[in-house]
Amino acid sequence: MPARVDTEAEKRLAAEAAARLVEDGMTVGLGTGSTVARLLPPLAERELEIRCVATSPRTESAALDLGIPVEPFDRLERLDIAIDGADQVALDGWLVKGGGGAHTREKIVAAATGRFVVIVDSGKAVERIAAPVPLELQPFGLRATLRELGDVRLRDAAPSPDGGVIADYVGEVGDPMELAARLALVPGVVEHGLFPPVLVSEVLVGRGNEVERLEI
């Protein structure tokens, strides 16, 4: 019988390793999700002089409760590092993000930082990206957008932090670059949850009792 994977412990290991990458004086992007929630306590314990931007109200509230300063993104000219989780991390460096419905903000932050670090448990590491792929959609003309997209399922979830409708593409992924381009061309799609390897600096994978570091 295979050994039971302690997902909680793996998330915590990856999160603690990422917290150690943050240094005094840095500007830091904080992602959204269960693994990022485990990043905040060890980051707060270090009592660093940092300035942070959060990708969701949930992360902002949790960070402020722990004494981590959070500012509006537009006050920061650049980000030294951003740390976020992922729903899937493929061997070729593609990510799927957006299980928490904040992938539009997460992608903006990932593109604006000099170092985007992804933290996951071993169950999120996959050979190839597969559905579902999260989508944020404009509420206006939603039915027309859904018809154009085809294989999409609306999610029973709260709107995105910016009021978008959250859905999932559930069709064949195939080449993620081709799918990303096709989804982006559909009017009404605010953003999709496919993150290309060019955005990713490194991935920290909690695996058993260790952290595996993958450079993309």
Name each region found by the language model.
Residues 2-6, 58-60, 64-216:
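Conserved phosphate- and dinucleotide-binding cores of soluble alpha/beta proteins
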Residues 1-82:
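N-terminal glycine-/serine-/threonine-rich phosphate-binding loop
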